[in-house]
């Protein structure tokens, strides 16, 4: 973004100092918790969040309302989320199998620790409640594995499967221990079956994705206008 818009200032935050050092001079990374009070000295024209499912007790109060306040009138807020539930349109996913069981555990555990794994499906409503206007929503399907006929979706599916496999432990260990008091050995035993079944090409599973963006109204502008997209 810094290279594409050299006249802009790009600020990004993360909980850990994991970002690259070699960046354009107008890009700045800060170690910060976005759930804390935002104390930026200036307003923004564009604020963006992505893949924050499970991070917030309340996306509305901790993020969306702060983003609204931090934007200039006419500025845009955009969120991209893939929710933590698994879907299937043709009954090829076993509802009692290890993949379905793991996703169900993820949803239950995330609610137990008050960090919901369902966020994307609520974004548009949150934007409306906060007061954004000209709200748009696009929904996408993130295939798990290479089962899709479309070449692009097939490639996305392979990458998404690899992403899930790489993150299974990180998604599971602390969450399942805190919610269910499971030991690392018990969790790993469960994950063996999940890894074996996750990319089965006979299973046409996917995860729902949501892209929502809206504009902070100008003074005197009516709020709540929304546009549905695909």
Predicted segment positions?
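Conserved SAM-binding strand-loop segment of SAM-dependent methyltransferases
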Residues: 25-36
């Amino acid at each position: 973004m810094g290279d594409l818009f050299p006249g802009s200032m790009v600020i990004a935050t993360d909980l850990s100092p994991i970002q690259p050092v070699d960046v354009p001079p107008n890009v700045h990374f800060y170690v910060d918790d976005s759930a804390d009070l935002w104390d930026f000295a200036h307003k923004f024209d564009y604020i963006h969040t992505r893949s924050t499912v499970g991070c917030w007790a309340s996306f509305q109060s901790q993020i969306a309302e702060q983003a609204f306040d931090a934007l200039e009138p006419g500025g845009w807020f955009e969120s991209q989320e893939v929710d933590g539930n698994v879907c299937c349109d043709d009954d090829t996913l076993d509802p009692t199998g290890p993949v379905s069981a793991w996703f169900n555990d993820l949803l239950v555990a995330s609610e137990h620790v008050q960090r919901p794994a369902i966020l994307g499906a609520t974004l548009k409503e949150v934007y409306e409640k906060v007061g954004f206007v000209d709200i748009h929503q696009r929904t996408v399907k993130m295939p798990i594995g290479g089962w899709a006929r479309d070449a692009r979706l097939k490639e996305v599916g392979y990458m998404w499967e690899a992403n899930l496999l790489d993150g299974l432990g990180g998604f599971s260990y602390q969450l399942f221990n805190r919610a269910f008091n499971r030991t690392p050995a018990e969790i790993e035993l469960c994950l063996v079956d999940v890894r074996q079944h996750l990319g089965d090409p006979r299973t046409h599973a996917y995860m729902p994705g949501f892209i929502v963006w809206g504009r902070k109204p100008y003074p005197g502008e009516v709020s709540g206008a929304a546009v549905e997209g695909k």
